[in-house]
């Protein structure tokens, strides 16, 4: 039995600054709305180096000590696995600047639920970022419906 599968790795990083968190209002028409910065892991790149690079490209900040705190994953209709690595950190240097990916700013953490978020499941994604007893957000198909479990 062949256990290899096609996988695409991406990352997302929650950067905290006191009671505020860095958000990005993405302009990509395929995935618009407010989320955390992040992006694709390039071939040959370590996961940690990828999240540091993506945050720098999208925000102007250089993060350090990113902690892997969970994953989100699913299979698409072609049986291709998509894995989002969730990181968080409070360690950064540099000056905040927006990029072509979207505008970035510090937002009160408690205000996140009132913003136009990029995904309807962002509140449950936040649970994986924050709750130590959760580490996985897994989407699966049940007939024509997409469901998910938090584990």
Task: List where the protein language model places each region.
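Conserved N-terminal beta-strand and adjoining loop/helix that marks the start
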Residues: 1-21, 37
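Short hydrophobic/aromatic beta-strand or adjacent loop that forms the aromatic wall/cage
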Residues: 8-12, 82-86, 123
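Conserved hydrophobic/aromatic beta-strand scaffold that supports enzyme active sites
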Residues: 14, 23, 86-88, 106
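Conserved Nudix-box catalytic region and its N-terminal flanking loop in Nudix hydrolases
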Residues: 20-56, 144-151
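A short coil-to-beta-strand element that immediately follows conserved catalytic motifs
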Residues: 62-70
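Active-site-adjacent beta-strand/loop module that shapes the phosphate/pyrophosphate-binding cleft
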Residues: 74-95, 127, 133
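NUDIX/MutT-family hydrolases
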Residues: 88, 97-130, 149-150
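Charged phosphate-binding loop/patch that engages nucleotide di/tri-phosphates or the phosphate backbone
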Residues: 128-151
